[in-house]
Amino acid sequence: MKEIETTRKYYDKHGDHWINTKTNSFAHEKPFHKLVSLWPEKGRIIDIGCAGGIHVPLFLGIGRKLKYQGIDISKLFIKIATRRYPQLSFSLGNVADSTTLPKLKFDGFYASAILMHVPFEHWDTMFSNIEKITKPGSYGYITLPITHPSAVKQDADVRHFTIITEAEQIDYLKKRNWKLKQKVTLDGTSTANVWRYYIVQLP
């Protein structure tokens, strides 16, 4: 997919800068506590779009008993994550391409600010791929924007963003039979109330 490849190249080129400006590993601390209470105590969890390991401190602290696996489409991000957390498992993976995903069944998933980079016409494939690698009835976490979330001037940002309304997001989750357990509005770096986070349960 052209859009995903363009986004990958962006992160491979600008990943170091992105990592150094996205430093709040605990921005999602409150929902993470909820997730840990829903996931099996020693469950295997996949972090989809792990970047340079920005959310790993949550897993090493609050979720320290969980078995962590991080995937990302960017080689640079995987290199950074592996350097920072050599005791954990990271690998290249594209959530829209099942052939690149781990051949495991996970007890839950974490997908913060990543599903938006896949064009909407490929969401059915992407969501099916998530279902294939996670156990039935497992819980997951996703964040999606309702407006463009980037602090970069939009015409200078070549990454793909799928922007749909909150109602459209919820309708899509319902169409997939993903049960909505929690929904909260979050501020972005440069825009208020831009993010919706969802804790979901798969069918």
Please report, for each region that a protein language model flagged, where it lies by residue.
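Class I (Rossmann-like) S-adenosyl-L-methionine-dependent methyltransferase catalytic domain
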Residues: 1-46, 51-102, 121-125, 129, ...
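Helix-to-beta-strand junctions that scaffold the AdoMet/dcAdoMet cofactor pocket
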Residues: 118-120, 134-136
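Short catalytic micro-motifs in class I SAM-dependent methyltransferases
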Residues: 113-117
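A conserved beta-strand element that flanks and buttresses the S-adenosyl-L-methionine
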Residues: 110
